[in-house]
């Protein structure tokens, strides 16, 4: 394969991220120019966000030719579909759907869809967005060794890794975690308990909230291995105010309780004791 080709001029988040994924997958240079005769027919050139054609088998990923009533999609959507990542990305990347709306419907329609004022959209910008898109737009060609190309490769690699490892993590949580009911009567709490396993993941609490969201379980709190020691972490789920861990700050086996009450750390490992601490933290 020869290159990734995208349009010159202003760059947007969708074409930038689409190119990031393609750079990470194929390691190709990027040409920023209008397609020349034959580019769309050349299987060695991946044409992104320009060219008026969506033909994945020929490496062409434009959405501008779609009718106005077409569901919101962008060049990033088309590349994710081609890579087999779209469904997971829509599930796990909350920023994707607003990106599709913004690129295909514009800022005012996107603000209406989000239920916010147009001015709020501008407040969500950062120098990271502005600088990366501006520097990308200034380039005619990018290749390995160029700082912008290397950053784009890292962005693409991280997105690939995030989607792959999160799916693996959710499967891991499903295989090991269980829901406990602790306390009695009206005082009962539903807690998702993640036991210590061997080997233990780098971040034992990773994926727990996503798993709860996917399963639809009603959960008040979480118990999970402390990655910094042999004990466990205790926390609220979705900032559930039924739990205030400052209430157990004085327990002998609790060595940390956040002043705002949303998380605590304990050296306890016995499940009965962990359940007791959750009950004592109940407001």
What is each PLM-predicted segment?
Residues 121-201, 217:
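Acidic catalytic cores of enzymes that act on phosphate-bearing nucleotides/polynucleotides
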